[in-house]
């Protein structure tokens, strides 16, 4: 009788590289497609993004490589800034240029009328996501149901708009805005609702994301800058040039308290054990904090009862 074969664990393909790449995503390029491209360019074992950006939108798409994928939730929860253009006179099925026209009006809003409604969309508000959205209804994505011709009731939910600014009204048909908002806000829904309030309908005709906290606009790297490096024939030189654009994994955790620890403490944390925090300078209790040793991220954990208990370890 033959012995059962031992299950072989495949070695992951690619490099075990970690860090954040803050991509300036071009138009007509999906978020999943962008992640696949970056993963291939960097020859990374693992990659993921922190917040979908529609193909018809451009701008910031933070992409996590390797261990940085463990910090994605901290970026997903961050504030976001968008610049967008609303075209008045038409409401569309998708609330952007892609969808068919479902309502229209010859009315056009005066600039002062637009300014007058902005306070209604600032602070904590109730917002109904678009029919074409990733919201799940009875286990199915709303956009899948919408594509099948179903109109579904999507419940309104609480979102927070920190700032909504009218930048310009270049003509009667369009208005440019900037919004700083919290997690779960749909800018397309914002355009739809403002159009309804103004009695003229409206949809997004341009959308660009310029910030996903803690990452700023100056950190963005255009895709063409990265793809141009494919011309470097030497593989090691090419990867070194690409790696220069990576941001340290711990940057995503900048809103949390930081502990600087020694190598012995780092070893204990990596084994899943807590470390004692002694002395007057020991930090107060906190549900989440992160620890670094020699500038490298070691763990995310909880501070309580005079110790740091690891929840996630790195490297």
Curated annotation (Swiss-Prot):
Catalytic activities: uridine(55) in tRNA = pseudouridine(55) in tRNA
GO molecular function: RNA binding; tRNA pseudouridine(55) synthase activity
Keyword Cytoplasm: no
HAMAP family, A to Z: TruB_bact
UniProt function note: Responsible for synthesis of pseudouridine from uracil-55 in the psi GC loop of transfer RNAs.
Assigned EC number: 5.4.99.25
The UniProt record lists the keyword Isomerase: yes
Gene3D superfamilies: Pseudouridine synthase
Cystines in this chain: none
Active site: 54 (nucleophile)
Protein name: tRNA pseudouridine synthase B
Phylogenetic classification of the source organism: Bacteria, Pseudomonadati, Pseudomonadota, Alphaproteobacteria, Hyphomicrobiales
Keywords: Isomerase, tRNA processing
CDD domains in alphabetical order: PseudoU_synth_EcTruB (cd02573)
